[in-house]
């Protein structure tokens, strides 16, 4: 793709998200979502192959359905309140439709079906945008309609997402699908605490974006998309492999890494609000995620897959790809846990 065209498309994606985040009018929010969706489809189809085309079509269909639901919720709200301003939704039906439309855009269960398929069909760089930047707009709208969200509905969606995000990733060997299921689980954690402490949701979102960006950058640097190709990176770049493994464990929420901090704070927040069974269930289900990350780490670090002698010589050659931000991102995605006492002011 022509670099100028790519820059224009990326700017449109960013503009769409920014319009959604700063608007106080429902129609502008809807327009922002549409701009964002139509601009990201060419980015997904950068590589002209049938898989990318299929993934883009799936993405387009699900996002269009979510946009229609969103517009329907906006119109129902308009009928009851008589205004377009973004504020408390007066009608429970409008609130439910809006929550479901945003859950569909975020890829939360039971509307998660498109996330693994789409992420698997597109290049790593497009997958990075899909699983990080694309979460900002729907999350900001959820944040704005907080007072009118149905607690039972949002907690059901979050528990389903955490469970499916854990179970779905168990039998995967494709790294992009593992990242997609991880994204579903993380969305579940974020929305679970949304009504108790929205600032905690933002903290979780920031840490999730940092960890996912680091992960995808490392995958792009090593050109790895499967467990097998990840196991061969020992021969190509031993230090890079160690970084991949530590970041993977951080994504699984293993203490004392960064990924443990949001989980710890969310469980603490929910316990403070006299919710005991729910955080217990969430913590148990999070072990599924940790299990498939541990298994990936084990298969890469402690088992030797068959490889040729030529492959074993690759460590001698310097890496040609420049990754300026990688050291900073790796530190942020693994070493933020000591900052937890400072962040306790978020409460």
Curated annotation (Swiss-Prot):
Protein family per UniProt:
Belongs to the complex I subunit 2 family.
Which organism does this record belong to? Ovis aries
Q: Name any one Pfam family assigned in the record.
A: Proton_antipo_M
Q: What is the membrane topology noted in the UniProt record heading this document?
A: Multi-pass membrane protein
InterPro entries assigned to the protein according to its UniProt record, in alphabetical order: Complex_I_Subunit_2 (IPR050175), NADH_DH_su2_C (IPR010933), NADH_UbQ_OxRdtase_chain2 (IPR003917), ND/Mrp_TM (IPR001750)
User: Can you state which reaction this protein catalyses?
Assistant: a ubiquinone + NADH + 5 H(+)(in) = a ubiquinol + NAD(+) + 4 H(+)(out)
Q: What does this protein do?
A: Core subunit of the mitochondrial membrane respiratory chain NADH dehydrogenase (Complex I) which catalyzes electron transfer from NADH through the respiratory chain, using ubiquinone as an electron acceptor. Essential for the catalytic activity and assembly of complex I.
Q: Name one GO cellular component term.
A: respiratory chain complex I
Bilayer-spanning residue ranges: 3-23, 25-45, 67-87, 96-116, 122-142, 145-165, 178-198, 200-220, 237-257, 274-294, 325-345
Broad class of enzyme this protein falls into? translocase
Question: In the Enzyme Commission scheme, what number(s) does this protein have?
Answer: 7.1.1.2
- Mostly located where? mitochondrion
Can you say where in the cell this protein is located? Answer: Mitochondrion inner membrane
List the Gene Ontology MF annotations in alphabetical order: NADH dehydrogenase (ubiquinone) activity
Task: Tell whether Oxidoreductase is among the UniProt keywords.
Answer: no
Q: How does it assemble?
A: Core subunit of respiratory chain NADH dehydrogenase (Complex I) which is composed of 45 different subunits. Interacts with TMEM242.
Q: Which gene encodes it?
A: MT-ND2
Among the record's GO biological process terms, what is one? mitochondrial electron transport, NADH to ubiquinone
Magnesium in keyword set: no
Sorted alphabetically, which keywords does the UniProt record give?
A: Electron transport, Membrane, Mitochondrion, Mitochondrion inner membrane, NAD, Respiratory chain, Translocase, Transmembrane, Transmembrane helix, Transport, Ubiquinone
- This protein is called NADH-ubiquinone oxidoreductase chain 2
């Amino acid at each position: 793709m022509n670099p100028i065209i790519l820059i224009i498309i990326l700017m449109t994606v960013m503009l769409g998200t920014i319009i959604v985040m700063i608007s106080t009018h429902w129609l502008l929010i809807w327009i922002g979502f549409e701009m964002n969706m139509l601009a990201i489809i060419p980015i997904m189809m950068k590589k002209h192959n049938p898989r990318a085309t299929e993934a883009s079509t799936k993405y387009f269909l699900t996002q269009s359905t979510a946009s229609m639901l969103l517009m329907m919720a906006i119109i129902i709200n308009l009928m009851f309140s008589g205004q377009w301003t973004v504020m408390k939704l007066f009608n429970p039906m409008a609130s439910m439709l809006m929550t479901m439309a945003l859950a569909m855009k975020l890829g939360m269960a039971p509307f998660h079906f498109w996330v693994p398929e789409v992420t698997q069909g597109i290049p790593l760089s497009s997958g990075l945008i899909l699983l990080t930047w694309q979460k900002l707009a729907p999350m900001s709208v959820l944040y704005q309609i907080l007072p009118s969200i149905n607690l039972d509905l949002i907690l059901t969606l979050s528990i389903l997402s955490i469970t499916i995000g854990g179970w779905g990733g168990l039998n995967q060997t494709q790294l992009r699908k593992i990242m997609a299921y991880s994204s579903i689980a993380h969305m579940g954690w974020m929305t679970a605490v949304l009504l108790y402490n929205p600032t905690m949701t933002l903290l979780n979102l920031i840490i999730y974006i940092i960890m996912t960006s680091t992960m995808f950058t490392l995958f792009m640097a090593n050109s790895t998309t499967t467990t097998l190709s990840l196991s061969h990176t020992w021969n190509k770049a031993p230090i890079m492999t160690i970084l991949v493994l530590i970041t993977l464990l951080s994504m699984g929420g293993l203490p004392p890494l960064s990924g443990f901090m949001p989980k710890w704070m969310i469980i603490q927040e929910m316990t403070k609000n006299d919710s005991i069974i729910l955080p217990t269930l969430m913590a148990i289900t999070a072990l599924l995620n940790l299990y498939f990350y541990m298994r990936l780490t084990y298969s890469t670090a402690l088992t030797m897959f068959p490889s040729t002698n030529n492959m074993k010589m690759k460590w001698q050659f310097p890496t040609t790809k420049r990754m300026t931000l990688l050291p900073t991102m790796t530190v942020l995605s693994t070493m933020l846990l000591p900052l937890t006492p400072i962040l306790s002011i978020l409460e």
